Swiss-Prot record:
Keywords noted in UniProt: ATP synthesis, Cell inner membrane, Cell membrane, CF(0), Hydrogen ion transport, Ion transport, Lipid-binding, Membrane, Transmembrane, Transmembrane helix, Transport
Record's subcellular location: Cell inner membrane
Gene of this entry: atpE
Protein source organism: Aromatoleum aromaticum (strain DSM 19018 / LMG 30748 / EbN1) (Azoarcus sp. (strain EbN1))
Name assigned to this protein: ATP synthase subunit c
Keyword Transmembrane among UniProt keywords: yes
Length: 82
């Protein structure tokens, strides 16, 4: 039983850690491409900024869904009978 709970804790940590790394890399790449596009065509900066912030929110939402799933794994009892 202790092994299963240990693996669940490890899995929850991996879900949160890898999700955070992926979200940070994605937002970083998106921000750099936004700056490149704004430098090339400054007249499109407002439209691009709106889309960038919308996508940043969606990327963060995907990470937070992963955190919720990890918390469900962490606090659920796999040995509970239905």
């Amino acid at each position: 039983m202790e092994n299963v709970l240990g693996f669940v804790a490890l899995a929850a940590g991996l879900i949160i850690g890898l999700g955070a790394i992926g979200a940070c890399i994605g937002i970083g790449i998106m921000g750099s491409k936004y700056l490149e596009a704004s430098a090339r065509q400054p007249e499109l900066m407002n439209a691009l900024q709106t889309k960038m912030f919308l996508l940043a929110g969606l990327i963060d939402a995907a990470f937070l869904i992963g955190v919720g799933i990890a918390m469900m794994f962490a606090f659920a009892n796999p040995f509970q009978l239905v």
